[in-house]
Amino acid sequence: MSLFLKDDSIQIREVWNDNLQEEMDLIRDVVDDFPYVAMDTEFPGIVVRPVGTFKSNADYHYETLKTNVNILKMIQLGLTFSNEQGNLPTCGTDKYCIWQFNFREFDLDSDIFALDSIELLKQSGIDLAKNTLDGIDSKRFAELLMSSGIVLNENVHWVTFHSGYDFGYLLKLLTCQNLPDSQTDFFKLINVYFPTVYDIKHLMKFCNSLHGGLNKLAELLEVERVGICHQAGSDSLLTSCTFRKLKENFFVGPLHKYSGVLYGLGVENGQVAI
């Protein structure tokens, strides 16, 4: 499969509460053959900043992440599956399949949010009213995700970009609890639910000429976007293709020694970085 995908070769499968079971059944069928899972979330922004004294920037970043994830709700999750060669599943169709999960819990009328973030999501085509009406029940999704084979599985490689918040929202959903107080405990949960994680923003540290966010990196690597920016399905596909191009161009051999690190957080393999 070429990294230069065309819009008409991709099907972004919109998942709502009424088709959640059948789409999760498809995912269960593809994960063994396509064990690289690129992930992106959309959420209502960052609404609070902690005050006080912190030992490090990483401690401050985690406290900010924890506080916001605990009071906010995920709006959308995108998943793109691929294999070692970068091929995507077709699920018996003539198109490559990407999944976009739409959640119901966020309420524009009663929940706190960052106005600029919500306006950006609206401009990107996310219909918050439809999410409220037809969106997925998070607890039901968590139950299906737990039995899907994509979490708690060391053979699955999670691929992300600057993904502390993405994993924060998924952990909150999977555990039905607020995030732990300490980074060390947070990473213990990461290691249980997502044993193999690659954060592209961390990998970029080892590629001297690369910088910027996901869109800038994709542009530098000549990876074209399919779909709409700031929608989780399209962003997860761009993450997947960018990871593949980065791996091919800058790394030789397995990447395992780079796994388990989330950019901006000061914990590696459960140990707080000094």
UniProtKB/Swiss-Prot annotation:
Indicate yes or no for the key word Repeat.
no
Q: What is its main location?
A: nucleus
Q: Tell me which Pfam families the record gives.
A: CAF1
Recorded GO cellular component terms are:
CCR4-NOT complex; cytoplasm; nucleus
Keywords for this protein: Cytoplasm, Exonuclease, Hydrolase, Metal-binding, Nuclease, Nucleus, RNA-binding, Transcription, Transcription regulation
Give a yes or no for keyword Signal in this entry. no
Q: Which residues bind a divalent metal cation?
A: 40, 42, 166, 235
**Could you say which EC number(s) this protein's record lists?**
3.1.13.4
For activity, the cofactor(s) needed are: a divalent metal cation
> Oligomeric state and partners?
Component of the CCR4-NOT complex, at least composed of CRR4 and CAF1 proteins.
Please describe what this protein does: Ubiquitous transcription factor required for a diverse set of processes. It is a component of the CCR4 complex involved in the control of gene expression.
- Please report which protein family the annotation says this sequence is part of: Belongs to the CAF1 family.
Q: What is this protein called?
A: Probable CCR4-associated factor 1 homolog 6
Q: Which organism is it from?
A: Arabidopsis thaliana (Mouse-ear cress)
Identify the coding gene: CAF1-6
